[in-house]
From Swiss-Prot:
Keywords: Hydrolase, Nucleotide metabolism. Belongs to the dCTP deaminase family. Archaeal dUTPase subfamily. Its EC number is 3.6.1.23. Coiled coil: none annotated. One of its GO terms (molecular function) is dCTP deaminase activity. The keyword Transmembrane does not apply. This is Deoxyuridine 5'-triphosphate nucleotidohydrolase. CDD domains: trimeric_dUTPase (cd07557). NCBIfam families: PRK02253.1. Pathway: Pyrimidine metabolism; dUMP biosynthesis; dUMP from dCTP (dUTP route): step 2/2. SUPFAM superfamilies: dUTPase-like. Homotrimer. It catalyses: dUTP + H2O = dUMP + diphosphate + H(+).
């Protein structure tokens, strides 16, 4: 069952009232990066190598950015602390989709905390203003959790 926004808002610090939706929380853009170079992924993560991220936008310094077709990494401004019995799923806001862009996200595991990063694919040029609400995250209760997230992205 989805955990309502009246509860899930407590997984964040410093939310604006406009971010609290019916059953989820809107997430705001903080930084946008271009991806350069090759990534490497394997079964054990021993060979894992992320490509280079080149920062092209920062909501703390920039007013807006026009993004052309392509793929980008978006880091959100909102710091999340997910409880040990909860998982999160992020989706693009419908306004973003209607403008010709989308986001791709992995599962936000129980115990994850930090500012998530998403892959944004732009099909039609789009202008994004600082702290624009681009995604909505919903949370679900998990039973029989095997453990909590302790990976390299925790706290980032």
């Amino acid at each position: 069952m989805i955990i309502g926004a009246n509860t899930s808002k407590n997984f964040f610090d410093n939310l604006e009232e406009e971010q609290i939706q019916q059953c989820g929380i809107d997430l705001r853009v903080w930084k946008i990066f271009k991806i350069e170079g090759e990534g490497v992924i394997d079964f054990s993560n021993e060979k894992r190598k992320l490509p280079n991220y080149i920062e092209i936008f920062n909501s703390e310094k920039d007013e807006h950015i026009k993004l052309d077709r392509g793929v980008y990494i978006v880091k959100v401004a909102d710091y999340i602390k997910i409880p040990e019995n909860v998982a999160g799923f992020a989706y693009p806001r419908s306004s973003l989709l209607r403008m010709g862009a989308t986001l791709y996200s992995a599962v936000h595991d129980p115990g994850y905390e930090g500012r998530p990063e998403y892959l944004m694919q732009v099909f039609n040029p789009i202008t994004i203003y600082k702290y624009a609400r681009i995604a909505q995250i919903v949370f679900v209760e998990c039973r029989d959790v095997k453990g909590v997230y302790e990976g390299i992205y925790k706290g980032r």
